[in-house]
Amino acid sequence: MKITAIETIQNKNFSNLVWVKIHTNEGITGLGETFRNPNAIVSYIHESCAPYLLGKDPLRFNEHADNLLNWTANRYIGYPTRSVEYRGNSAIDIALWDLKAKSSNLK
C-alpha cells in the first residue's frame, strides 16, 4: 500500500479546525484532525509533509513520525520543530493510525 494523496479539509463553521485525509492506492483513507492556526498548518502539510509522505507505505507510521519530527528542514534555532509542525504532525499521525485500523478491518 502506498500514499497517493494528502488532502486538507476546512469548514467555515469550524474555522480553527483542519482535517487531514490521507489517500492510498488501495482506496483506503485515513482521517486526522488538528486545531488552531489552520492556514499555517495547511501550508505545512502541503509544503513539507506531503512531499515526504507521497509514495511511502502508510503503515510505517513510527518511521514517518520520527522523520517528520526530526527532519532537518523543520529545525528552528536548533530545536526539531515549532507548534505548527507539532500540530500538523499530530494530524498526520492520527490519519495514519486511522488508516491502519481500516486496513486491518478494525471498526
What are these regions (language model features)?
Residues 23-103, 107:
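Metal- or metallocofactor-binding catalytic centers and their adjacent structured scaffolds
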